[in-house]
Amino acid sequence: TLASGHAYGTIREMAAAAKEQQLQLIGISEHAPGIPGTVDPFYYGNLRVIPRVIDGVEILHGCEINVLNGGRLSLEQKYIDRLDYAIVGIHGLCYQNEGTDGNTTNLIECMKNPKVKLVSHPDDDHTPLDYPRLVQAALQYHVALEVNNSSLVKKDQRLNCYQNYRTMLALCQQYRVPIVVDSDAHDPSWVGRQDLACALLESVGFDEELVLNADLARLKSFLGVE
Protein backbone atom coordinates (compact mmCIF):
# COMPACT_ATOMS: atom_id res chain seq x y z
CA THR A 1 0.00 0.00 0.00
CA LEU A 2 0.94 3.67 0.22
CA ALA A 3 2.79 2.86 3.42
CA SER A 4 5.56 1.09 1.51
CA GLY A 5 6.67 4.33 -0.12
CA HIS A 6 6.57 3.19 -3.75
CA ALA A 7 3.00 1.91 -3.95
CA TYR A 8 -0.16 3.87 -4.56
CA GLY A 9 -3.26 2.50 -2.85
CA THR A 10 -4.67 2.28 0.64
CA ILE A 11 -5.64 -0.98 2.33
CA ARG A 12 -9.31 -0.23 1.64
CA GLU A 13 -8.64 0.58 -2.01
CA MET A 14 -6.75 -2.68 -2.39
CA ALA A 15 -9.62 -4.57 -0.74
CA ALA A 16 -12.15 -2.89 -3.03
CA ALA A 17 -10.07 -3.91 -6.04
CA ALA A 18 -9.90 -7.46 -4.70
CA LYS A 19 -13.69 -7.51 -4.43
CA GLU A 20 -13.98 -6.36 -8.05
CA GLN A 21 -11.72 -9.26 -9.04
CA GLN A 22 -13.90 -11.65 -6.99
CA LEU A 23 -11.06 -12.53 -4.64
CA GLN A 24 -11.97 -13.99 -1.26
CA LEU A 25 -8.78 -12.93 0.51
CA ILE A 26 -5.94 -10.48 0.07
CA GLY A 27 -2.58 -10.34 1.81
CA ILE A 28 -1.28 -6.90 2.70
CA SER A 29 2.51 -7.17 2.93
CA GLU A 30 4.33 -3.87 3.31
CA HIS A 31 8.06 -3.78 2.70
CA ALA A 32 10.15 -4.05 5.84
CA PRO A 33 12.81 -1.46 6.70
CA GLY A 34 15.66 -1.48 4.23
CA ILE A 35 13.56 -0.31 1.29
CA PRO A 36 13.63 3.51 0.95
CA GLY A 37 10.46 5.23 2.12
CA THR A 38 8.80 2.23 3.73
CA VAL A 39 7.23 1.92 7.16
CA ASP A 40 8.89 2.17 10.54
CA PRO A 41 8.85 -1.17 12.40
CA PHE A 42 6.35 0.37 14.83
CA TYR A 43 3.76 0.10 12.02
CA TYR A 44 3.52 -3.63 12.66
CA GLY A 45 2.68 -3.13 16.31
CA ASN A 46 -0.85 -1.87 15.68
CA LEU A 47 -2.19 -4.10 12.90
CA ARG A 48 -4.96 -5.35 15.18
CA VAL A 49 -6.96 -2.14 14.63
CA ILE A 50 -7.50 -3.00 10.95
CA PRO A 51 -10.75 -4.88 10.23
CA ARG A 52 -10.26 -8.53 9.33
CA VAL A 53 -12.88 -8.24 6.59
CA ILE A 54 -13.27 -5.21 4.30
CA ASP A 55 -15.90 -5.15 1.53
CA GLY A 56 -16.40 -8.86 2.09
CA VAL A 57 -12.71 -9.59 1.45
CA GLU A 58 -10.68 -11.24 4.19
CA ILE A 59 -7.49 -9.38 5.11
CA LEU A 60 -4.28 -11.09 6.17
CA HIS A 61 -1.34 -9.10 7.51
CA GLY A 62 2.12 -9.97 6.28
CA CYS A 63 5.42 -8.28 5.63
CA GLU A 64 7.98 -8.64 2.86
CA ILE A 65 11.16 -8.82 4.91
CA ASN A 66 14.52 -8.23 3.31
CA VAL A 67 17.23 -10.87 3.30
CA LEU A 68 20.38 -9.13 4.53
CA ASN A 69 23.96 -10.20 4.06
CA GLY A 70 24.90 -12.71 6.70
CA GLY A 71 21.51 -14.40 6.47
CA ARG A 72 19.78 -11.83 8.68
CA LEU A 73 16.22 -10.53 8.51
CA SER A 74 15.56 -6.79 8.28
CA LEU A 75 12.77 -6.83 10.89
CA GLU A 76 13.01 -7.64 14.59
CA GLN A 77 11.38 -10.84 15.82
CA LYS A 78 9.02 -8.98 18.17
CA TYR A 79 7.38 -7.42 15.12
CA ILE A 80 7.53 -10.58 13.02
CA ASP A 81 5.56 -12.34 15.75
CA ARG A 82 2.66 -9.93 15.23
CA LEU A 83 2.19 -10.94 11.59
CA ASP A 84 -0.09 -13.59 10.11
CA TYR A 85 2.82 -14.61 7.90
CA ALA A 86 6.21 -13.34 6.76
CA ILE A 87 7.70 -13.25 3.28
CA VAL A 88 11.45 -13.10 2.70
CA GLY A 89 13.15 -11.86 -0.41
CA ILE A 90 16.37 -10.40 -1.74
CA HIS A 91 16.25 -6.75 -2.78
CA GLY A 92 19.30 -5.11 -4.28
CA LEU A 93 18.61 -1.83 -2.47
CA CYS A 94 19.74 -3.41 0.81
CA TYR A 95 21.73 -6.47 -0.25
CA GLN A 96 25.15 -7.00 -1.84
CA ASN A 97 25.33 -9.88 -4.31
CA GLU A 98 27.44 -12.75 -2.90
CA GLY A 99 27.17 -15.07 -5.89
CA THR A 100 24.98 -18.14 -6.28
CA ASP A 101 26.20 -20.02 -3.22
CA GLY A 102 26.27 -17.04 -0.87
CA ASN A 103 22.89 -15.70 -1.97
CA THR A 104 21.28 -19.11 -1.56
CA THR A 105 22.84 -19.65 1.86
CA ASN A 106 21.63 -16.25 3.08
CA LEU A 107 18.12 -16.84 1.78
CA ILE A 108 17.89 -20.32 3.30
CA GLU A 109 19.07 -19.01 6.66
CA CYS A 110 16.13 -16.57 6.66
CA MET A 111 13.72 -19.33 5.62
CA LYS A 112 14.46 -21.14 8.89
CA ASN A 113 12.41 -18.59 10.85
CA PRO A 114 9.13 -20.38 11.68
CA LYS A 115 7.03 -17.33 10.80
CA VAL A 116 8.44 -17.26 7.26
CA LYS A 117 5.98 -18.94 4.91
CA LEU A 118 6.88 -17.52 1.49
CA VAL A 119 9.89 -16.53 -0.60
CA SER A 120 9.29 -13.55 -2.88
CA HIS A 121 10.36 -13.38 -6.53
CA PRO A 122 13.25 -15.91 -6.46
CA ASP A 123 13.80 -15.21 -10.14
CA ASP A 124 16.47 -12.58 -10.78
CA ASP A 125 19.98 -13.48 -11.92
CA HIS A 126 21.27 -10.13 -10.69
CA THR A 127 21.36 -12.09 -7.41
CA PRO A 128 21.49 -15.69 -8.72
CA LEU A 129 20.27 -18.68 -6.74
CA ASP A 130 20.96 -22.40 -6.62
CA TYR A 131 17.47 -23.72 -7.39
CA PRO A 132 17.99 -27.34 -6.32
CA ARG A 133 19.21 -26.11 -2.91
CA LEU A 134 16.40 -23.57 -2.66
CA VAL A 135 13.64 -26.05 -3.46
CA GLN A 136 15.05 -28.64 -1.06
CA ALA A 137 15.18 -26.00 1.68
CA ALA A 138 11.60 -24.97 0.93
CA LEU A 139 10.57 -28.58 1.40
CA GLN A 140 12.56 -28.91 4.62
CA TYR A 141 11.37 -25.67 6.24
CA HIS A 142 7.78 -25.74 4.97
CA VAL A 143 8.09 -22.57 2.89
CA ALA A 144 6.34 -21.90 -0.42
CA LEU A 145 7.98 -20.20 -3.40
CA GLU A 146 6.38 -17.34 -5.28
CA VAL A 147 5.73 -17.00 -8.99
CA ASN A 148 5.47 -13.24 -9.27
CA ASN A 149 3.42 -11.86 -12.14
CA SER A 150 5.06 -8.44 -11.86
CA SER A 151 8.47 -10.00 -12.46
CA LEU A 152 7.19 -11.33 -15.77
CA VAL A 153 5.73 -7.94 -16.69
CA LYS A 154 9.10 -6.25 -16.09
CA LYS A 155 11.26 -9.11 -17.36
CA ASP A 156 13.78 -6.61 -18.70
CA GLN A 157 14.60 -5.79 -15.06
CA ARG A 158 14.50 -9.36 -13.71
CA LEU A 159 17.40 -11.08 -15.44
CA ASN A 160 16.46 -14.51 -16.90
CA CYS A 161 13.27 -14.63 -14.84
CA TYR A 162 11.34 -16.83 -17.27
CA GLN A 163 14.05 -19.47 -17.46
CA ASN A 164 14.64 -19.34 -13.72
CA TYR A 165 10.95 -19.92 -13.07
CA ARG A 166 10.90 -22.87 -15.46
CA THR A 167 13.84 -24.40 -13.60
CA MET A 168 12.24 -23.73 -10.22
CA LEU A 169 8.83 -25.05 -11.24
CA ALA A 170 10.27 -28.30 -12.59
CA LEU A 171 12.00 -28.88 -9.25
CA CYS A 172 8.88 -27.93 -7.28
CA GLN A 173 6.91 -30.44 -9.30
CA GLN A 174 9.57 -33.10 -8.77
CA TYR A 175 9.78 -32.64 -5.00
CA ARG A 176 6.13 -31.61 -4.44
CA VAL A 177 6.99 -28.17 -3.11
CA PRO A 178 4.07 -25.71 -3.13
CA ILE A 179 4.03 -22.30 -4.76
CA VAL A 180 1.91 -19.18 -4.64
CA VAL A 181 0.98 -17.20 -7.74
CA ASP A 182 0.30 -13.52 -7.24
CA SER A 183 0.19 -10.05 -8.70
CA ASP A 184 2.61 -8.31 -6.31
CA ALA A 185 0.27 -5.37 -6.86
CA HIS A 186 1.65 -1.99 -5.86
CA ASP A 187 -1.49 -0.21 -7.08
CA PRO A 188 -5.15 -1.24 -6.90
CA SER A 189 -5.31 -1.51 -10.70
CA TRP A 190 -2.94 -4.49 -10.53
CA VAL A 191 -4.74 -6.48 -7.85
CA GLY A 192 -5.58 -9.97 -9.09
CA ARG A 193 -3.51 -9.74 -12.25
CA GLN A 194 -1.85 -13.12 -12.71
CA ASP A 195 -2.17 -13.61 -16.46
CA LEU A 196 1.50 -14.05 -17.33
CA ALA A 197 2.20 -16.25 -14.33
CA CYS A 198 -0.77 -18.49 -15.06
CA ALA A 199 0.25 -18.76 -18.71
CA LEU A 200 3.72 -19.82 -17.60
CA LEU A 201 2.31 -22.50 -15.29
CA GLU A 202 0.11 -23.79 -18.09
CA SER A 203 3.03 -23.89 -20.52
CA VAL A 204 5.01 -26.20 -18.22
CA GLY A 205 2.02 -28.31 -17.18
CA PHE A 206 2.33 -27.40 -13.52
CA ASP A 207 0.16 -29.33 -11.06
CA GLU A 208 -2.61 -27.06 -9.73
CA GLU A 209 -2.65 -29.00 -6.45
CA LEU A 210 0.73 -27.42 -5.68
CA VAL A 211 -0.64 -23.88 -6.14
CA LEU A 212 -1.59 -22.91 -2.60
CA ASN A 213 -3.79 -19.97 -3.46
CA ALA A 214 -5.86 -21.94 -5.95
CA ASP A 215 -7.79 -23.09 -2.87
CA LEU A 216 -8.58 -20.84 0.09
CA ALA A 217 -8.60 -23.60 2.71
CA ARG A 218 -5.31 -25.00 1.40
CA LEU A 219 -3.65 -21.58 1.57
CA LYS A 220 -4.87 -20.78 5.08
CA SER A 221 -3.87 -24.20 6.35
CA PHE A 222 -0.34 -23.74 4.99
CA LEU A 223 -0.04 -20.28 6.52
CA GLY A 224 -1.41 -21.52 9.82
CA VAL A 225 -4.22 -18.97 10.01
CA GLU A 226 -7.87 -19.56 10.83
Report each predicted region and the residues it spans.
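Histidine-centered nuclease catalytic patch
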Residues: T1-L2, H31
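Histidine/acidic-residue-rich catalytic or RNA/ligand-binding cores of hydrolases
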Residues: H6-G9, G37-P41, P128-Q136, K155-L171, ...
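Catalytic domains of carbohydrate-active enzymes, especially glycoside hydrolases
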Residues: M14-I26
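Extended substrate/RNA-proximal surfaces in nucleic-acid metabolism proteins
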Residues: K19, A32, G37-V147, S151, ...
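Short acidic/polar active-site loop segments enriched in Thr and Asp
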Residues: Q24-L25, S29, K117
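Short acidic/histidine-rich active-site segments
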Residues: H31, V177-V191
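Conserved short secondary-structure transition element at the edge of the structured enzyme core
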Residues: Y165-S183
